[in-house]
Amino acid sequence: AVDNSDIKIGVSIWSSTDVLGSQCKLILDEAAKALGVQVQYVDQGHVSEKVTASVEQLAAAGCQGIIICNSSDTEMTSAIKTCDDNKVYLSQFFRIISEENSADIYQAAKDSAYYIGAVHEDEPANGEELVNILLNKGDRNIGLIGWEQGDATWLGRWEGYKAGVEKWNADHPDDHTADDGLEGTRLSRDPPPGFL
C-alpha cells in the first residue's frame, strides 16, 4: 500500500497568485493537508506551450496525478499523451473538452486509461446569468472577451451570453443591447491594442 505522504499531485494553473488562482491554491493546499498528500504547482499563464510543458514538468517531478486548467482543447492532446506515457492520472478543473468541437480529443480522453474527467461549471447558464446581471444594471454596450481560440469554457459562456442577449432583445424591443451582442464577437477575436 502507498502511504499518502508519498502521493504527489501536480497542479497546472494559469496563476497561483492572482485573485482567483490564489483562492484555488488555498483550497487545494487545505485539501492536500487534510489528505496528507504533497502538492506541486506550475503557473503556466494560459500560454499553450507553457500549458503542455507544465504537464511534462509535473510528470517528470514524480506526480502520480495532475489537475489542469488548460486554455484550449488542443492542449489536451499533448497532456493526455504525456500522462498516458507516464502513467499519471489527469483531470481538468474549470475546463472541459468539447465533445462537439473537439471530437477527436474528446475520444482520446475517453480512450485514455489515465484521463479521469473534468470539474466545471454550467458555462451556458453562467454566461446567460452574467449578461442578465449587466443588462438589469442598465448596461447595453456589453462585450465578452475570450482568452484562447478553442476554449470550450469560453464558448459555453458565449452561448449563454448570446441566449441572454437574444431573450433580452425579444422581451425589450425598445431597449436592445448595442449591436445585438455582435460586439462581443469582434472583441473576442481582436482585443483592443494594449488590452492584454
What do the predicted segments below correspond to?
Residues 1-196:
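A residue-level marker of the well-folded mature domains of exported/periplasmic proteins
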